[in-house]
A protein has these predicted regions:
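Carbohydrate-active enzyme catalytic cores, enriched for enzymes
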Residues: 117-122, 254-255, 278-423
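Low-complexity, glycine/alanine/valine/leucine- and proline-rich hydrophobic stretches
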Residues: 386-387, 391-476, 481
């Protein structure tokens, strides 16, 4: 993408990108969308690798392709204050090569999509339907570009649009972030003088309060479903709704009071969320809808639009441009078309609702174009990310994550003590012990017949493996955290008490006052109850690489009930994808057993072995991060005891000899409440989680409407 404009390393020392680059990317994406547009532009049928669906599904998919790219066009138009270089019909030819300007192109599309007799008419808005989601994208676009597009439409077209949008009134939707969709539509109808339901708006804003957990974070519906929807939904739509209702429905004091509340939450959110991005621009690979990619930067732009400087303007642009470049430099938008995947096409991170146009929710990441060109977010010198300034350790109390980054490799890890996801599904995108900006969760058969299941504690029992039944409690602390969860081992209930703390391996070598750049070592402990006859497996981070992954295993039979002098250990090493011309970035993942203690059985009856399971997630495709994948894990034979205490070390980014060096200086003993740890003159406790307020196997997601 650098071909659009020379890099500006003076103003943008980290990314070289300026507003000009962002505009060029937007024009490239919009030009590509036009190639797949219907004759009157109301449908965009991006190519699909899968089989064709029903006619109704195809119509919805094409609406999605239109709506999400229309949002980008509206942001481009508004960011240019309605000015189309070359005149109304020429469009920004110098950047995007448009044959028809944005206003003319989309005026025709809006007419064709809503006229009753049009053969390009969009699907009706009905209960729990995808068209309502896409209608919200259209509403966002109409709102942002209102002075130049909506206001210029013939009254007939505005009436048709309002009639189509009115179909959402009184309808059911998913009881999660989707409650914001109908509310936003109703707010737009209110703002433009059409029939609407004010109570639906109020009900949606009231509903999301049920899910607010602090630090600016919301659960995506009932339970503990934390993910990037906080960034591109919960920290976006409330502000849009308030803007639409300015002078409607709410008194000035009420609107300002709500805005202060949402601003406070947004400030808290971006303060913590900025720590979830690696130095290479990668967001944390956790949660669903990862194919929306740079949509994750929307709240940083929204903060600037709202005058919130918790994250400085210079860091905002460095972060946002870094994320955008991360994906574009790795092939996410070949020929201007966003693929279904992460860097490129890859089905492993997709959900059933993803269609060819889905990735274009990334358009929300272009909110920064609404800022004037002379805004500090576009003119200030780029400032480094937190992980570029030293090792970081941050507690996000809302989702209950301990976030730690290492300056040496620029990788950020999120240790999970609160995200749980779907209650009835063992979803790796939500229920792993840890996530990172350089690894992706895996749950796939290995090439040797084993299982690739990263960052987990699970049990082999009978002919299968255990299923997570959900978190019962958890807390993130300044140096780690604790959680309690249940496992279903072939119908048997197993309770797992888990805790971890993070050590800086090289921290003691730092000069006084210097920034730590040391390797981050996780000391993990677990107490498993109800495991007689089961075979525990403890896995580390999965490494993905486009080159074959190296594996190594050491010391398969350590001593029991004491720290092993030569612990069982396993390591895998691969190479991260880098920008074109960059050298491959080496990345290793290692685990090492520190000690195991059994209750009510002779220790010599337990067998241990360390195994690096090497395999691809899917034949020929690997993971979203590489063609090959592997993870290190510790496997136990059948346990002769009903309770086992295990302590092990985990590291991402270092070789196994680092773990051995850490273990030499480590002393750990068990207590009824957890474990006591001493390491190089420091003392820590790793407490078990005492309170278990969360219900395992909660009800599935419900539907919502105000009635």
């Amino acid at each position: 993408m650098d071909s659009y404009s020379p890099l500006d390393t003076g103003q943008s020392a980290f990314t070289g990108w300026t507003r000009t680059h962002w505009e060029a990317v937007a024009d490239s994406l919009l030009t590509a969308a036009r190639r797949f547009s219907s004759p009157r532009h109301a449908k965009v049928g991006f190519p699909s690798a899968g089989p064709s669906g029903s006619a109704a599904q195809e119509a919805t998919d094409q609406l999605e392709g239109f709506a999400r790219t229309f949002l980008l066009a509206a942001l481009r138009l508004a960011g240019n204050q309605g000015d189309q270089p070359g005149g109304r019909t020429a469009g920004p030819r110098s950047a995007g090569g448009y044959a028809v300007g944005i206003v003319d192109w989309y005026s025709l599309a809006l007419d064709a999509g809503t006229a009753p007799d049009s053969d390009e008419r969009w699907p009706a808005l009905m209960d729990h339907g995808q068209p309502t989601v896409e209608a919200t994208a259209i509403v966002l676009g109409l709102h942002f570009s209102r002075p130049w597009l909506w206001n210029a439409l013939p009254q007939r077209v505005r009436d048709n649009i309002a009639t189509w949008l009115g179909g959402s009134r009184g309808s059911y939707g998913a009881d999660n972030n989707h409650v914001m969709f109908s509310a936003t539509i109703q707010a737009f109808l209110a703002a433009t003088g059409y029939p609407h339901n004010a109570f639906e708006i109020e009900a949606a804003l009231a509903r999301i309060e049920d899910w607010y957990v602090g630090d600016g974070w919301y659960s995506d519906g009932a339970g503990r479903r934390f993910d990037h929807y906080n960034a591109w939904t919960f920290q976006l739509y409330p502000f849009v709704i308030l803007d639409l209702l300015r002078g409607n429905l709410h008194s000035a004091s009420e609107s300002e009071g709500r805005r202060r509340l949402y601003r406070s939450r947004l400030a808290d959110f971006v303060q913590g969320y900025q720590h979830l991005f690696g130095a290479d621009g990668s967001p944390l690979l956790q949660g669903r809808s990862l194919t929306y990619r740079w949509g994750v930067v929307a709240p940083f732009w929204m903060a600037q639009l709202e005058g919130i400087t918790t994250v400085s303007p210079g860091r905002t642009r460095r972060l946002a441009s870094g994320v955008l470049r991360h994906f574009l430099d790795r092939g996410a938008a070949a020929d201007g078309v966003l693929s279904l995947g992460w860097h490129g096409s890859h089905a492993s991170i997709l959900q059933s609702y993803n269609a060819p146009g889905s990735p274009h929710w990334a358009s929300k990441g272009f909110l920064g174009l609404l800022l004037p060109a002379d805004h500090p977010a576009w003119t200030a010198a780029e400032e480094p990310l937190p992980v570029e300034m030293g090792n970081t350790s941050v507690v996000l109390a809302g989702p209950r994550w301990h976030v730690c980054g290492s300056m040496a490799d620029g990788v950020v890890r999120a240790l999970n003590f609160g995200s749980d996801g779907h209650p009835q599904r063992d979803d790796g995108l939500y229920r792993r012990l840890a996530y990172s900006t350089a690894t992706v969760p895996v749950l796939e058969p290995g090439l040797d017949g084993g299982l690739l299941r990263d960052n987990d504690i699970y049990l082999k029992a009978g002919n299968g493996t255990s299923r997570h039944r959900g978190l019962r409690g958890g807390v993130a602390r300044y140096d780690g955290g604790s959680s309690t969860f249940a496992l279903d081992a072939g119908g048997r209930d197993v309770v797992a008490n888990y805790a971890t703390t993070v050590l800086d391996e090289d921290a003691d070598r730092q000069r006084p006052g210097s920034r730590s750049e040391g390797v981050r070592i996780e000391v993990r402990i677990a107490r498993l109850t109800g495991v007689i006859g089961c075979e525990p497996v403890l896995s580390g981070y999965a490494i993905s690489s486009d080159m074959p992954v190296e594996t190594a295993v050491w010391a398969e039979r350590p001593a029991m009930n004491e720290a092993a002098a030569s612990p069982a250990a396993a390591r895998v090493t691969g190479w991260r994808r880098t920008a074109p011309g960059g050298l491959p970035a080496r990345l290793a993942s290692a685990v090492a057993l520190y000690r195991t203690d059994l209750t009510d059985a002779a220790p010599e009856r337990t067998v241990h072995r360390a195994v690096a399971v090497h395999g691809q997630c899917r034949a020929g495709s690997g993971t979203a991060l590489g063609e090959h994948s592997a993870l290190p894990q510790l496997e136990f034979g059948p346990l002769p005891a009903n309770t086992v205490h295990i302590a092990w070390l985990v590291c991402l980014g270092a070789e196994a000899d680092t773990l051995a060096r850490t273990a030499v200086d480590l002393a750990l003993c068990w207590t009824d409440d957890g474990a006591q740890l001493q390491w190089r003159g420091t003392s820590r406790v790793l407490p078990w989680q005492r309170e278990t307020p969360w219900a395992a196997d909660a009800l599935n997601q419900d539907v919502f409407r105000w009635h």
